[in-house]
From Swiss-Prot:
Its EC number is 2.3.1.48. The lineage of its organism: Eukaryota, Metazoa, Chordata, Craniata, Vertebrata. Gene3D superfamilies: 2.20.25.10, Cyclin-like. Residues 189-193, 249-252, 283-286 are annotated as: Core promoter DNA-binding. Found in a ternary complex with TATA box-bound TBP. Part of a TFIID-containing RNA polymerase II pre-initiation complex (PIC) that is composed of TBP and at least GTF2A1, GTF2A2, GTF2E1, GTF2E2, GTF2F1, GTF2H2, GTF2H3, GTF2H4, GTF2H5, GTF2B, TCEA1, ERCC2, ERCC3, TAF1, TAF2, TAF3, TAF4, TAF5, TAF6, TAF7, TAF8, TAF9, TAF10, TAF11, TAF12 and TAF13. Associates with TFIID-TFIIA (DA complex) to form TFIID-TFIIA-TFIIB (DAB complex), which is then recognized by RNA polymerase II (Pol II). Found in a RNA polymerase II initiation complex. Sequence repeats lie at residues 124-200, 218-294. The modification Phosphoserine is found at residues 70, 76, 92. Its main location: nucleus. A zinc finger (TFIIB-type) spans 11-42. This is Transcription initiation factor IIB. Residues 244-316 are annotated as: Necessary for TATA box-bound TBP complex formation. The keyword RNA-binding does not apply. One of its GO terms (cellular component) is RNA polymerase II transcription regulator complex.
Length: 316
């Protein structure tokens, strides 16, 4: 029951059985409840009061303190939309029982495609613990490629995966193709193709990867001590300087250097353990290791403490 006070132009909701009771408002459900008898006096009540809070968190992640998502500047309309709740009264339905007011988001097909790609990018980045700046750069790269329409015929998931790979390289935290493949549904070959096409389409480039780009992460994932990591880094760098590994990928050289350093220490790791982390096959590690093994005495740092002498290292 609603009664209007002379002192107040707005209707005041009261309990018909306890008109003087101060109603309790359930903000989540939008209900006005009488504390005396528990009667729900008003439902679907809208709070028309002023909102004095300031929202400084405009990240794309969910913010429980705001209504709806934050604005996305990469989309044409910022992804601002109106959500209509389900009706409860008879007036909310037509003669066939269907809701008269259906929730339709006024979003273009291109924005919808980009939104799906952005969600996929965020999911992939989260699975390999990449920071937000990588996600933002990837989203920007995808938007540029999508709007240029220069990769027509390529799946958006493949383009998104390649953009993530490029963003990692450009931000100085490179990931291998295998690592990107592991968190996407796209093959290494297809990501590689899109990678080359995107660089050409955007007329951009990425820095060449080196063994040092992966060494710290690989050794950390293998739970190797700092001494072994430093030795592996030194071995890989010297192998490149001495031109012992021409044509070999930095990842395979890094894996071989880690294998050599670990075998010389008390913290030994197998080729398979290293291969699983680096994303390379055992045979690939062996091929690079055989190239550097003959010069092993020249590759270790002078202060390295050997648990296994150089002449006792595996010959493979």
């Amino acid at each position: 029951m609603a009664s209007t006070s002379r002192l107040d132009a707005l209707p005041r909701v009261t309990c018909p059985n306890h008109p003087d009771a101060i109603l309790v408002e359930d903000y989540r459900a939008g209900d006005m409840i009488c504390p005396e008898c528990g009667l729900v006096v008003g439902d679907r009540v809208i709070d028309v009061g002023s909102e004095w809070r300031t929202f400084s968190n405009d990240k794309a992640t969910k913010d429980p303190s705001r209504v709806g998502d934050s604005q996305n500047p990469l989309l044409s309309d910022g992804d601002l939309s109106t959500m209509i709740g389900k009706g409860t009264g008879a007036a909310s339905f037509d003669e066939f029982g269907n809701s008269k007011y259906q929730n339709r988001r006024t979003m273009s097909s291109s924005d919808r495609a980009m939104m799906n790609a952005f969600k996929e990018i965020t999911t992939m980045a989260d699975r390999i613990n990449l920071p937000r700046n990588i996600v933002d750069r990837t989203n920007n790269l995808f938007k540029q490629v999508y709007e240029q329409k220069s990769l027509k015929g390529r799946a958006n998931d493949a383009i998104a995966s390649a953009c993530l790979y490029i963003a990692c390289r450009q931000e100085g935290v490179p990931r291998t193709f295998k690592e990107i493949c592991a968190v996407s549904r796209i093959s290494k070959k297809e990501i590689g193709r899109c990678f080359k096409l995107i660089l050409k389409a955007l007329e951009t480039s990425v820095d060449l990867i080196t063994t040092g780009d992966f060494m710290s992460r690989f050794c950390s994932n293998l739970c190797l001590p700092k001494q072994v990591q430093m030795a592996a880094t030194h071995i890989a760098r010297k192998a490149v300087e001495l031109d012992l590994v021409p044509g070999r990928s930095p990842i395979s050289v890094a894996a071989a250097a880690i294998y050599m350093a670990s075998q010389a220490s008390a913290e030994k790791r197998t080729q398979k353990e290293i291969g699983d982390i680096a994303g390379v096959a055992d045979v690939t590690i062996r091929q690079s290791y055989r190239l550097i093994y003959p010069r092993a005495p020249d590759l270790f740092p002078s202060d390295f403490k050997f648990d296994t002498p150089v002449d006792k290292l595996p010959q493979l």
